Amino acid sequence: MARKKIALIGGGQIGGVLAQLAALRELGDVVMFDIVEGLPQGKMLDIAEVGSVDGFDCNLKGTNSYEDIKGSDVVIVTAGLPRKPGMSRDDLIEVNSKIMTSVAEGIKANAPNAFVIVISNPLDAMVTLCQKITGFPYNRVIGQAGVLDSARFKTFIAWELGVSVKDVNAMTLGGHGDDMVPLVRYASVNGIPVMELLERKYKDKAKAKEVMDAMVKRTRGAGGEVVALLKTGSAFYSPASSAIQMAESILKDQKRVLPTCAYLNGEFGVKGFYVGVPCVLGENGVEQILEFELDAEEQAMMDKSVAAVKELVGSMK
């Protein structure tokens, strides 16, 4: 049986981690594209040379030609400028829109049957632009945001409660920005509501809410927290791991339920926009969007987040 093929567009920090993770998990052969001559070739050679050490068998190739992504099953797009301290994701829209336009044209011409996972920021606008230019079906063009935002939320909960992050279940909805919606009501530790555990820990409902509010705020600003600490770039380990989880679910038809930036056609009261919602990801890309009832407070936050997405998308020239 022929191996699957994964194409990575962008040879920066995220691209390098993506290539290594794809190889370690043996998801298929991997090709990395970048416009900088020598950069993708060097990174892929570096990773390939430890195949005997890490125990993986796959073909790794770096290239400066879009022709080499032909036959790809999944394309993951990281190309674009990263944030610097003091910048929001939205500040990148003008320059990264130009980059995404070129990238999407390259994908359309050379990998017309691929599933596309966009990581580039501002995410909600970039995935919208990518789908528009490629013309691919909505189920085949998605964005990575919710898996990472949810992972950050889970991490902060685990640290606060002193439990394994493996036992924490939590999710965010909405756009990939300061108005994202961490779902407090559905956060649990092995089925036990997190708010109940916080109330027992602090023996004070007001204090428990204060602690949760702080975790929600930190989740919303988590990407900026990393940017401020690094000073020269943005997060790259966590976005790469999150995108690989999505790609693996598609390539292996795992049907994982993952928060995904997906095109909505009336779900959650949103029509005609890409927004983060729980999706079943399988061999057909987005196979289901799992809709559920939001309470009044959650709906208000979701409406605010969607409004921010609409404004962002509308600002693209």
Swiss-Prot record:
Q: Where is the active site?
A: 176 (proton acceptor)
Q: Record's SUPFAM superfamilies? A: LDH C-terminal domain-like (SSF56327), NAD(P)-binding Rossmann-fold domains (SSF51735)
The alphabetized list of GO BP terms reads:
lactate metabolic process; tricarboxylic acid cycle
Write out the entry's keywords from A to Z: NAD, Oxidoreductase, Tricarboxylic acid cycle
Specify which residues bind NAD(+) according to the UniProt entry for this protein.
10-15, 34, 96, 119-121
Q: Binding of substrate: at which residues? A: 83, 89, 121, 152
Similarity comment text for this entry: Belongs to the LDH/MDH superfamily. MDH type 3 family.
NCBIfam families under this entry?
MalateDH_bact (TIGR01763), PRK06223.1 (NF004863)
Q: What is this protein called?
A: Malate dehydrogenase
Gene, per the UniProt record: mdh
